[in-house]
């Protein structure tokens, strides 16, 4: 069986989007697709649509409801949607532009509280009091939320969208990803970690239509590197940096001082991380750098100012 990747385009809600179409060719020359491969190309299209129109992603829609401590049906009532609409959005349906903007706006808890007050006639007194109390708690915690957003802006140069493979921007996920890699591979030089993260993200995009770390990458002389990699590796107390002398050169190794909490990662994400770590664990920093130099993702974008496009995931040779 041979996997075939072909550039295609699709009109979605009146707009044309480019994507990579995935099919399989058997020994008799017959081509076919699977539910999974069709899902990957559809994700490429719908994620571009979400990014273009600032429509929240599925994980953001779920996280918003959980932050406010409400059921999906109650969110629909307060937002003025159909009874099951919010639940459908949590299952992957893409909101309309107007509903997407509504969901985006109520990520501000004060805006949501105004809507709760406007919907009071549709809530029991007990429901109303409980929701208001929760929203007051959320608003009181806004300083903590703004601190997290400041850290996100500091670590992730590119916002969520095409440049970062549509991955969530989360410092907790990034920290635990680093800790997990170090737990699997042991102390790891920064130069090697750069390539490991690249392969994890680009393999994830190829297999799922979405990256994992939230990072975007540039192609420099020594291979693909995450944007702001120096800030990333110094951002977490649980990731220590140690200078070591290797062949008369000072190199910085990363060491984990805590165990990773992988509760925020899916089974599919963890399987991809494990696959890359297993393949790269025995490679030296020099070996993995040489491997990355075989990648069209690096060769086609060396010394260019823009980030490496995630569409290059479909030309990976190292994994």
How would you label these PLM feature ranges?
Residues 1-53, 123-126:
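N-terminal flexible/basic segments that precede or flank functional cores
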Residues 54-69:
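Short, amphipathic alpha-helical "recognition" segments used to contact nucleic acids or chromatin
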Residues 64, 78, 89, 232:
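Residues in the recognition helix of alpha-helical DNA-binding motifs
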Residues 69-85:
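Short alpha-helical DNA-recognition segment
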Residues 81-95:
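Recognition helix of helix-turn-helix/homeodomain-like DNA-binding domains
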Residues 101, 111-319:
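Domain-edge interaction signal
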